[in-house]
A protein has these predicted regions:
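Helix-to-loop junction immediately C-terminal to a conserved catalytic motif
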Residues: 48
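Conserved ABC transporter NBD signature motif
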Residues: 56-71
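Conserved ABC ATPase "signature" region
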Residues: 95, 106-121
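The feature captures the beta-strand-to-loop junction immediately N-terminal to the Walker
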Residues: 30-35
Length: 145
């Protein structure tokens, strides 16, 4: 469970997030909707531990972000456009990312790719993927993380 309490973020005196409070239950899928510049990406960056709040707190599974843990280890997210190496296949891109954490097998990577409707055996380079295929690969990345 993710619990956000009175989260505020300011840059140079300008408040970009103002007293956000919400609870996100484990096992559910959520989406953030809002106009450009409304703070959706900034909120996600806080939840992922990339940015620290000016005030307020984020608790993930009972651990306070920035105090008990630096970043959540069980949350996958796609923020903006995922960056992949265009000269490699989808599987090879995800394999390189997985090698950083040493937590996931080749079969688990292939299953994540299949789950989003792509072929893990395809040798097609990501640079030749359509936008939709790249977005699907980004979802596979979030799932495997």
């Amino acid at each position: 469970m993710i619990e956000i309490k009175d989260l505020t973020k300011s840059f140079d005196g300008v408040e970009v997030l103002s007293h956000i409070s919400m609870t996100l239950e484990k096992g559910k899928i959520y989406g953030l909707v809002g106009r450009n510049g409304s703070g959706k990406t900034m909120l996600m960056k806080h939840i992922l531990g990339f940015v620290s709040p000016t005030s307020g707190s984020i608790t993930i599974d009972g651990k306070i972000l920035g105090k008990d843990i630096d970043a959540p280890d069980n949350i996958g997210a796609i923020i903006e456009n995922p960056g992949f190496l265009p000269g490699y296949s989808g599987f090879r891109n995800l394999k390189m990312l997985a090698s950083i954490r040493h937590k996931i097998s080749d079969e688990e990577i292939k299953n994540a790719i299949r789950l989003v409707g792509l072929d893990p055996e395809s040798k097609k380079h990501v640079g030749k993927y359509s936008l939709g295929m790249r977005q699907r690969l980004g979802l596979a990345q979030a799932l495997m993380e």
